[in-house]
Structure formats: structure tokens, C-alpha cells
């Protein structure tokens, strides 16, 4: 990762003031919210659904539990968790971006998913929930956009119950050189063109590609989770390491 002073951070490949990054990321997601689901399907050829299904399967969520779907966006994971926890459980879909939260709320309500789902606009670095509150937290394709990732992980640790688990699904580092080269070519040349045609926004998808390259790799993120208190932290490489699922427990 690039060197950063205490007052600056990265926005893709650019160095920006830390207090500016959140607004810049917000602009990206305000821009792409309406086409977010369609772009996910196009960008990943639908494979994101397999990655999310694997995350659900690894979550261990059961009936009656309380789940936080952080950076939950358009609610793919929330929809699945809602069925798993049942009427006696609760799922909180939290996102810092009001446009994404609006799309997610409308999508789930149109599917009849109501009653055990609540919506909260929240910053991952300072979660507005009590200590020891959730049985499980997921953050899918959201952590790389957070300015202070260590603060966010510590905040998630705080609101987890003892015995609770965090699952981080995020783009990561491909494990094979030929795959890495092909992935770079796709990310930097094809992906922005898809964004321009479908979402009328090549810049946001150029940022997406750059933000993935600046995100901590598998071992670094594993250590970051351990540093804030998570135990038994492991990760699974998916699609050759293009994506990784990290899981850690609070004891």
C-alpha cells in the first residue's frame, strides 16, 4: 500500500486529505446507486452471487439471531439473512450512503421483505450500536472504501457479542500471475467502458479498479483483524484470489 501521512490517505491511486475521502467516496456511490445491481452482474458475470452465497453459508447465522449487514447497499445479503433469522431475529442493513440505502430499502420492500429488517445510515468507523449487540456482522465489498479501516474493524469488534463473528468479503490479490495480468487488463480497460455505457460514469469504475489495488492483501487484512482483537481469523480465496472471504471471532 502507498505511504500515507497522518492527514492523508488514498482515493484510488490519488493521495487526498483524510477528511475529503468520505465525501469523494459518497459521490461515487450516489452516482452508481441506481445501476449498482446491474453493474455487479455485468462486471462479475454474475459470479458475485456465488461469492455472497458462500458468505451466507460461512456465517453460521441461525433463527432468532441479530445480524448487521454493514455497507449493505442494495441488500443482497440482508435478503438472505432475513429468511435465516426468521420472525424472532433481526437484520440491520447499514450503509453510510443515503442513495444506496434508499435503493436497498425499496428493493427489499418490493420483494415483501419487511418486519425483521431495519435500516440505519451509519459510518463503519463509529457504529451507533451498543456494545456486544450483534451475533454476526458482514461487510461485503465495503471495507476498501473506508478511510480508517482499523477504526472500522475495532468498531465492529465492539458491537459483536462474545462468540460473534465478522465476515469480510472483499476484492483481494489474485494468486496466479496469468490471472493477475488478465484481471488488470479487464479492470483498467474494459470495466470503465462498461461503466460509461451502462452507468454513464467511467470515472467511478476507474476508482473501483484502483481502490481494489490499494486494499490490503489477504495476509495483511488477516493481521489487521487480529490486531483489533479478532481470534481464529482465517480466509478463503475465491476465484483465484480475485475475492477473499475473511472470518474472525470475538471471544
Swiss-Prot record:
SUPFAM superfamilies: S-adenosyl-L-methionine-dependent methyltransferases (SSF53335). It comes from the Bacteria. Its EC number is 2.1.1.163, 2.1.1.201. Gene3D superfamilies: Vaccinia Virus protein VP39. It catalyses: a 2-demethylmenaquinol + S-adenosyl-L-methionine = a menaquinol + S-adenosyl-L-homocysteine + H(+); a 2-methoxy-6-(all-trans-polyprenyl)benzene-1,4-diol + S-adenosyl-L-methionine = a 5-methoxy-2-methyl-3-(all-trans-polyprenyl)benzene-1,4-diol + S-adenosyl-L-homocysteine + H(+). Pathway: Quinol/quinone metabolism; menaquinone biosynthesis; menaquinol from 1,4-dihydroxy-2-naphthoate: step 2/2; Cofactor biosynthesis; ubiquinone biosynthesis. One of its GO terms (molecular function) is 2-methoxy-6-polyprenyl-1,4-benzoquinol methyltransferase activity. S-adenosyl-L-methionine binds at residues 74, 95, 123-124. Keywords: Menaquinone biosynthesis, Methyltransferase, S-adenosyl-L-methionine, Transferase, Ubiquinone biosynthesis. GO terms for biological process: aerobic respiration; menaquinone biosynthetic process; methylation. Methyltransferase required for the conversion of demethylmenaquinol (DMKH2) to menaquinol (MKH2) and the conversion of 2-polyprenyl-6-methoxy-1,4-benzoquinol (DDMQH2) to 2-polyprenyl-3-methyl-6-methoxy-1,4-benzoquinol (DMQH2). Belongs to the class I-like SAM-binding methyltransferase superfamily. MenG/UbiE family. This is Ubiquinone/menaquinone biosynthesis C-methyltransferase UbiE. It comes from Erwinia tasmaniensis (strain DSM 17950 / CFBP 7177 / CIP 109463 / NCPPB 4357 / Et1/99).
